[in-house]
Amino acid sequence: MAMAVEFKTYVDQACRAAEEFVNIYYETMDKRRRALTRLYLDKATLIWNGNVVTGLEALANFFDMLPSSEFQVNMLDCQPVHEQATQSQTTVLVVTSGTVKFDGNKQHYFNQNFLLTAQTTANNTVWKIASDCFRFQDWATI
């Protein structure tokens, strides 16, 4: 029973972290994009529709090239990642989907997955992105 209570605590922590993170991430993406790299670890990797971007400088350059955006998140799911898979690093998997318009153009459906790791200091815990995978989910016309 103690294991179930402990796991529920991890799940609750993951959900709180994911909800806070998603609000911050997409607001920053839409309104303060130059600050977005602060949410990433130094050696984080982004895969954007199959294109790999690694490291803060490359991420900053990539985000600067994107047109202005309007994200709407319609779905959020999260779960803690088992500590055996992450060398005891507190990690949360966050999955989102929704719609985005770039430069006010046509709306696209998207799916985005994040691996967040807890960066703990004496005063608080900050969640940083270790891995980020973004994909458009538009239907192909046949």
Curated annotation (Swiss-Prot):
It holds the Pfam family NTF2. Keywords: Cytoplasm, mRNA transport, Nucleus, Protein transport, Transport. One of its GO terms (cellular component) is nucleus. GO terms for biological process: poly(A)+ mRNA export from nucleus; protein transport. Residues 17-136 form the NTF2 domain. The keyword Protein transport applies. InterPro entries: NTF2 (IPR045875), NTF2-like_dom_sf (IPR032710), NTF2_dom (IPR002075), Nuclear_transport_factor_2_euk (IPR018222). Regulator of protein export for NES-containing proteins. Also plays a role in mRNA nuclear export. This is NTF2-related export protein 2. The lineage of its organism: Eukaryota, Metazoa, Chordata, Craniata, Vertebrata.
